[in-house]
Amino acid sequence: MFIIKSMLYRLMQMIVVLFVISTLTFILMKLSPGNPVDKILHLDVAQVSMEQINATKDKLGLNDSLLVQWWHWMNHLLHFNLGKSFESKEPVTQILFNYAPITLLISFSTLVLSLCISIPLGIIAAKRFHKLSDKVIRVISTLSISLPAFFIGIILLFIVTNLMNIDSVILSQFILPVITLSLGMCAYIIRLVRSNLLMLLQSNIVQASRLRGMNERYILIHDLLKPTILPIIPLLGISLGSLIGGTVVIENLFDIPGIGYLLMDSIKSRDYPVIQGCVLFIGFFVVIINTIADLLTLLLDPKQRLQLGNPKSKANTPLISESSDRHA
């Protein structure tokens, strides 16, 4: 029952945050320079009568008070109506549906590649503590965190296009961006896995399993893997959300037709409805992904449930579930 209450509480938090994001997006567009009517009627290059200007304002609801405009904005948002682009006259929702798949594909591919690389490397670094392999992995992780993603992308582009003379759309618009985004994400996961595993290797349950004659692989899989990976879930939620925002630079660097590319192009042309749609998409995605990560952590981690169920409980709750005593 408590888990259901906690899940409902997090869902309510998500709704409140989404409401705030929607309101801030509305305010941001109202404070932005320029007039939508000027953009729609092309007043900078065309002669338009005052009747046409007033008719356009009435159609857009610009003559209403800000409160009424906000109410209409929220009502349209609930019906997935984000208006039409000033440039192409297409519905913004349809434009987002056209550009979002490539951004989501790159983001989730980055997540999968990062997990496949970082978890094994983090385990190796912990198992070979202070040995050569551990030092090499830590140095590479530090470099990956220190270098900006766009700088790594420029280096990869130079190597592939100039030195190797490879001209491939899949390579330049999918493989290289995924590698570029994965390097920084891998570094954080490697360090988290390494630190968690080093702490768990000193636990009493692991020592007891060794005394019972269990081999290291068995201990790793049955006693250490789950408590090592569980703390990664919240980090993945934050990282995946930031990946969507981070693709703004990477998509423009690699000329990828995704949400980030669309956002920059809309800013240049001052296409406000599309800008609103892109900001809302990124904000909503970040909030939803982080909420899912929190719910997964709550469902899978007994320690989290115990601490939430008993706020006075101390942080010294065993990191490894006592179910490991089944080996006894």
UniProtKB/Swiss-Prot annotation:
User: Into which family does the record put it?
Assistant: Belongs to the binding-protein-dependent transport system permease family. OppBC subfamily.
The scientific name of the source species is: Staphylococcus aureus (strain bovine RF122 / ET3-1)
Q: Which InterPro entries match?
A: BPD_transp_1_N (IPR045621), MetI-like (IPR000515), MetI-like_sf (IPR035906), Opp2B (IPR050045)
Instruction: Locate the transmembrane regions by residue number.
Output: 11-31, 104-124, 139-159, 170-190, 229-249, 279-299
Topology versus the membrane, per the UniProt entry? Multi-pass membrane protein
Which GO CC terms are listed, alphabetically?
plasma membrane
Superkingdom assignment: Bacteria
How it assembles, according to the record, is: The complex is composed of two ATP-binding proteins (NikD and NikE), two transmembrane proteins (NikB and NikC) and a solute-binding protein (NikA).
Give UniProt keywords alphabetically. Cell membrane, Ion transport, Membrane, Nickel, Nickel transport, Transmembrane, Transmembrane helix, Transport
What NCBIfam families does the record tag this protein with?
A: Opp2B (NF045470)
Please give the Gene Ontology molecular function terms for this protein.
nickel cation transmembrane transporter activity
Supply the gene name.
Answer: nikB
Q: What is this protein called?
A: Nickel import system permease protein NikB
Function description:
Part of the ABC transporter complex NikABCDE (Opp2) involved in nickel import. Probably responsible for the translocation of the substrate across the membrane.
Localization, per the record, is: Cell membrane
Principal localisation: membrane
Q: Please name every pair of cysteines joined by a disulfide bond in this record.
A: none
